[in-house]
Amino acid sequence: MDGIKYAVFTDKSIRLLGKNQYTSNVESGSTRTEIKHWVELFFGVKVIAMNSHRLPGRGRRMGPIMGQTMHYRRMIITLQPGYSIPPLRKKRT
């Protein structure tokens, strides 16, 4: 899995599963066309739409030093009716 890091399971993403939309975090340097091509090739599905947004990094403190986590990109992938993606591994939060 080059582009997709892990599936996202929030209240909104679980609600979107009923509309055949799947949510996952992807590498921030990946483009929409790369992710679409990769999903269609790996899962054997037809993607009809993709929405993406970049989420900001958060501040992390280690003692007196304040750090920053990396920003990441989240994709919402809409599939054609009749296609589905098996559940991806869930990342524990």
UniProtKB/Swiss-Prot annotation:
Subcellular localization: Plastid, Chloroplast
GO-annotated molecular function: mRNA binding; rRNA binding; structural constituent of ribosome
Entry keywords, A to Z: Chloroplast, Plastid, Ribonucleoprotein, Ribosomal protein, RNA-binding, rRNA-binding
Entries under InterPro entries matching the protein: Nucleotide-bd_a/b_plait_sf, Ribosomal_uL23-like, Ribosomal_uL23/eL15/eS24_sf, Ribosomal_uL23_CS
One Pfam short name: Ribosomal_L23
Gene Ontology CC: one annotated term: ribosome
Superkingdom of the source species: Eukaryota
GO biological process: translation
UniProt xrefs under PROSITE patterns: RIBOSOMAL_L23
Protein role: Binds to 23S rRNA.
Family affiliation: Belongs to the universal ribosomal protein uL23 family.
Assembly behavior: Part of the 50S ribosomal subunit.
Protein name in UniProt: Large ribosomal subunit protein uL23cz/uL23cy
Organism of origin: Panax ginseng (Korean ginseng)
Lineage: Eukaryota, Viridiplantae, Streptophyta, Embryophyta, Tracheophyta
